[in-house]
From Swiss-Prot:
Pfam families tied to this protein: Acetyltransf_1
InterPro entries for the chain: Acyl_CoA_acyltransferase, GNAT_dom
PANTHER family: PEPTIDYL-LYSINE N-ACETYLTRANSFERASE YJAB
E.C. designation(s): 2.3.1.-
Enzyme class, spelled out: transferase
Name under which the protein is recorded: Uncharacterized N-acetyltransferase in lysA 3'region
GO MF annotation list: acyltransferase activity, transferring groups other than amino-acyl groups
Length: 120
């Protein structure tokens, strides 16, 4: 289940974000978290299964037509189970009238799954 990020989940979110290759540096990671917390056009969602938060997806609402996926990360012990794909599908439900587009950091995953444009 995709839930909105809350400050109470900051450490978990930072841990998941740190799995992204461009978020290894602590200062960069803190800057990214601050952007999600303060900029209205950026949204961070967490994937929760039972009581565990095991995934994260972060977006930038570009305009009324597009949402750009900036971050997508799954706890390594839960990978290869379709969680990333499920997060993108749930995101499509949150933004049904917008096209989901990847950025340079998420393009390879999104293209591999072929899920942004509605193909299953």
């Amino acid at each position: 289940m995709l839930i909105r990020y809350k400050k109470a989940f900051e450490k978990i979110a930072m841990g998941l974000l740190s799995f992204m290759p461009n978020e290894k540096d602590l200062k960069k990671l803190q800057q990214t978290m601050k952007q999600y917390e303060t900029e209205e056009d950026r949204q961070l969602f967490l994937w929760k299964e039972e009581e565990d938060i095991i995934g994260l997806i972060g977006v930038l609402v570009v305009n009324e037509y597009e949402v750009e996926i900036h971050h997508i990360s799954v706890n390594p012990s839960h990978r290869h189970q379709g969680i990333g794909k499920s997060m993108v599908k749930a995101l499509r439900d949150i933004y049904p009238d917008k096209e989901l587009i990847p950025n340079e950091n998420t393009a390879a995953f999104i293209e591999k799954c072929e899920i942004c444009h509605g193909s299953e």
